[in-house]
Amino acid sequence: MKVAIIGTGNMGAGLAAALAGAGHNVSIGARDLAKAAALAERIGHGAIGGDIAAAVRVADVVVLALPFGAMEAAIESAGDVSGKVLIDISNPISADYKELVIGHTTFAAEEIQKLAPKALVVKAFNTIFASLLAPEAREGKVLQVFIAGNADTAKASVAELATSIGFDGVDAGPLSNSRFIEPIGEMNIHFGYFLGKGPAVAPVWVQV
């Protein structure tokens, strides 16, 4: 699959490395072209780095691996995203990571859909720490990625990506369910960083 990763932070780098390693065609876009190029070179597997618009132009799926506050500028830089799958992996959290800045009546994925009304926005990967994106870091455990979106075809593409790097993609319903998934992501941050569990934790829905 042709995937653009927008952002060179821990989540962007982790997803880019995992997806490129799984055989996907990965392009990395960032405002800092040198960082994008350096990350692509480090990852290898044919990954390329450049500006945001160039990365998006050659991709079918675009991963917005950015803080929620940076989304508007990134989408403006992306150019035409009509018909493309936009994966929102963000949690709209405060600077101290301790609370959501929006939620329940609106949510990050909905605001991104407003910014890109012709794109197919899907919420996913927001409950996974960057340290668990590399398949070997999970030590054989299969973690779940909750996938919410309004287009079944878009969700299927995201599930395929998740499966290709060793996750279990779980259909979490329409995009509006992101308002429930985002608090799960925030709770995971609390478990990891404020309750002493560390970043090797992730929520899993178990049917009994």
Residue ranges and their predicted role:
Residues 1-45:
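NAD(P)+-binding Rossmann beta1-loop-alpha1 motif at the extreme N-terminus of oxidoreductases
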Residues 23, 59-60, 119:
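Short, well-ordered alpha-helix to beta-strand connector turns
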Residues 44-46, 52-96:
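Rossmann-like NAD(P)-binding element
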Residues 49, 120-125, 169-172:
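General beta-strand structural signal in soluble alpha/beta enzymes
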Residues 90-137:
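Rossmann-fold NAD(P)-binding glycine/threonine-rich loop
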Residues 143-208:
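Active-site-lining helix/loop region of Rossmann-like oxidoreductase modules
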